[in-house]
Amino acid sequence: MRLRHVVSSLDLTRDDYFRIFELADKFSNVKKLNYLSGKVVSLAFFEPSTRTAQSFHTAAIKLGADVIGFASEESTSIAKGENLADTIRMLNNYSNCIVMRHKFDGAALFASEISDIPIINAGDGKHEHPTQALIDLYTIYKVFGEIDGRTFGLLGDLKYARTVNSLLRALTRFKPKKVFLISPSQLKVRREILDGLNYPVIETENPYDVIQDIDVLYVTRIQKERFVDEVEYEKVKESYVVDLKLVNMMKKDGIILHPLPRVTEIDRKVDKTTNAKYFYQASLAVPVRMALFYEVLGERKDD
């Protein structure tokens, strides 16, 4: 069955995840296909993006779709006072799918409630980034051959990082052994996220206490743009640095992921270790997003 909107990681079932992984495998080495020939994808980026916007653009083109859109709110009629609802309605007239990034929590859900075409959430405020979670899980699946039974450690800004929210919610579709949440007390995962999880979670501030148990260390930068108070940001901006000392305490086959961009939270010396998989992770963005586009827009025998 074709997917409709993808606003949250919870919009995907376990079967959806594995079906997308299988498609991503098939799309990994293709140059150009015509599966979406005649379709138009709108990239509605009300908030700046490099990797996400470019990988979605590339994914659409490689499937044969045409791409329209904008890269900032300033280049749209919203700068003239148009409301978001009207912008979404106008994009419905021009395209078959809208990939949307916005600075406000819940913007993608709002858009999905008024849109007649699929909305794919490319990040909304500090809320969610479900396609990044798809890439994260696909990376883990490619490295280990499975996701169930693994121990995760999420480190850094767990309060404002939307990638963290999406990954935690996506893991409810799997069976992680446990998840360590490693952050300063000011940047702990929000209660409404924790309350929806169905697996063991342990909160700590010290990565050295748990690093030996972790299969997947997921590192996030401190989200400066989400802080209202600059003083609070300055207090926590360099809370953690993943360096060789920490990495050398990991399991030999443990991996380090990061949604990027990286600032100072991973020492560049770590890049050369076998544990560092964040650039490999980034390389999987295009086939995963191709697979998602195909699930949302591709022709189906059962349509």
Curated annotation (Swiss-Prot):
Enzyme class: transferase
Residues that bind carbamoyl phosphate: R51, T52, R101, H129, Q132, L260, P261
Tagged with keyword Transferase: yes
Transmembrane segments: none
Binding locations of L-aspartate: K80, R162, R221
Catalysis: reaction(s): carbamoyl phosphate + L-aspartate = N-carbamoyl-L-aspartate + phosphate + H(+)
Stored Pfam families: OTCace (PF00185), OTCace_N (PF02729)
InterPro entries: Asp/Orn_carbamoyltranf_P-bd, Asp/Orn_carbamoylTrfase, Asp/Orn_carbamoylTrfase_sf, Asp_carbamoyltransf, Asp_carbamoyltransf_Asp/Orn-bd
GO MF annotation list: amino acid binding; aspartate carbamoyltransferase activity
This protein's UniProt keywords: Pyrimidine biosynthesis, Transferase
Entry EC no(s): 2.1.3.2
Role played: Catalyzes the condensation of carbamoyl phosphate and aspartate to form carbamoyl aspartate and inorganic phosphate, the committed step in the de novo pyrimidine nucleotide biosynthesis pathway.
Quaternary assembly: Heterooligomer of catalytic and regulatory chains.
UniProt name for this protein: Aspartate carbamoyltransferase catalytic subunit
Organism this protein belongs to: Saccharolobus islandicus (strain L.S.2.15 / Lassen #1)
Name of the gene encoding the protein in the UniProt record: pyrB
